Amino acid sequence: MHPQRKQRLMIVLFIVVFSSLAVGLIAYALRENINLFYPPSKIAAGDVPHNTRIRAGGCVKPGSVVRSQENLDVRFVITDGNADVVVSYTGILPDLFAEGEAAVINGIVTEAGDIQASEVLAKHDETYMPPEVAEAMKGKGQHQATCGGLNYGA
């Protein structure tokens, strides 16, 4: 093989190997940080993989927030109007977190079908609803500017 041709082949091989390695590392990093969004009805139906980090959203069901007296543990229920999911969280909730308002939860679905939250995000103003929550509720004929007016069921 001609030396110049051999040198070109080595350069091309180096570029291919380096590019493949870079793509592999990027894919691995993104896989660790991707949180798929699921509405409460999909979680309650069991359509969500357990022990996988997800993002869930809905309205905090009125009367469902229970705070521990001993520590920062909080339990509450989120709903999309069709199904309810219990959320457990340890930490300080955002100032705008309230019953009957939209919330987005980052966490892990337990074997029991509950969510162990690592982060709770609350709405920003009286007309804001997270896009994922609005999309999940749109097909139900219950989309509201906020969670007010949502039929929470009995």
Swiss-Prot record:
Q: Which GO terms of the cellular component aspect does the record hold?
A: plasma membrane
List residues in topological domain: Cytoplasmic: 1-8
Per UniProt, what is the membrane topology?
Single-pass type II membrane protein
Q: Which UniProt keywords apply?
A: Cell inner membrane, Cell membrane, Cytochrome c-type biogenesis, Heme, Iron, Membrane, Metal-binding, Signal-anchor, Transmembrane, Transmembrane helix
Periplasmic topological domain residue ranges: 30-154
TM spans (from-to): 9-29
Under Gene Ontology molecular function, one entry of this record is: metal ion binding
Chain residues that bind heme: H124, Y128
Q: Does the keyword Cell membrane apply?
A: yes
Q: Major place of localization?
A: membrane
Q: Which SUPFAM superfamilies does UniProt cross-reference here? A: Heme chaperone CcmE (SSF82093)
Q: Where in the cell is it found?
A: Cell inner membrane
Q: One biological process GO term for this chain? A: cytochrome complex assembly
Question: What InterPro entries does its record include?
Answer: CcmE (IPR004329), CcmE-like_sf (IPR036127), NA-bd_OB-fold (IPR012340)
Q: Which Pfam families match?
A: CcmE (PF03100)
**Its biological function?**
Heme chaperone required for the biogenesis of c-type cytochromes. Transiently binds heme delivered by CcmC and transfers the heme to apo-cytochromes in a process facilitated by CcmF and CcmH.
> What family does the Swiss-Prot or TrEMBL record give for this protein?
Belongs to the CcmE/CycJ family.
Q: Which PANTHER family match?
A: CYTOCHROME C-TYPE BIOGENESIS PROTEIN CCME HOMOLOG, MITOCHONDRIAL
Q: Report the protein name in the record.
A: Cytochrome c-type biogenesis protein CcmE
Q: What are the top taxonomic ranks of the organism?
A: Bacteria, Pseudomonadati, Pseudomonadota, Gammaproteobacteria, Cellvibrionales
